[in-house]
Amino acid sequence: MVLAKSMSKPGPRAMIKLKRVLRYFEGTMHIGITYSEDSEDGEMLTAYVDSDHAGDLDTGYSTTGVALYFAGGPVDWMSTKQTVVAISTVEAEYVAMSKACLMVIHFRNLLTSINQQQVQATNIFEDNQGAVSLSKGSKITPRTKHIDIKFHHVRSLVAKGVVDVKYVETDLQRADILTKSLGAVKFLKNRLLLLGV
């Protein structure tokens, strides 16, 4: 994402970053995604969602990361800046969860169109317990009343049994790599998680 920001006015620093990315691609050509119906989740769609709270120091916006898995490997993923300034980590994660739900709905519809209908709720894995609780609550509380109503469709999908939001430890959060820069050791571990290895 850092490299993408410099595309409008690329300079020498952007070229150095680009060369580093190209060297990374050359050195990792042997790494890939493997799909298998014998995977842990079989042919169940699952999603991992994460957010960094106010990661953009210039604007205060958070970054959303979502990874969708099917047959043991990622089939869709995204990393994007949120369009609202979240005043808490719970809000940032909940906004990210809203984006994940939209992706899940789209992919469930796609699977239905090819006769792979998802009967059970799609598991969405989130590493913020407050956001998990918020998604399952039916009341708007004083702590959450400021959150824009457009994000509360998450609760509706949970109530209908379309999605089931579950807590996952941060160390096992596959979407973490999509929200922030990580150190070398954590990056290598998260890369394997993201690929479903």
Give, region by region, the residue ranges found by the protein language model.
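Conserved helix-loop functional segments at active or binding sites
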Residues: 27-31, 54, 74-77, 106, ...
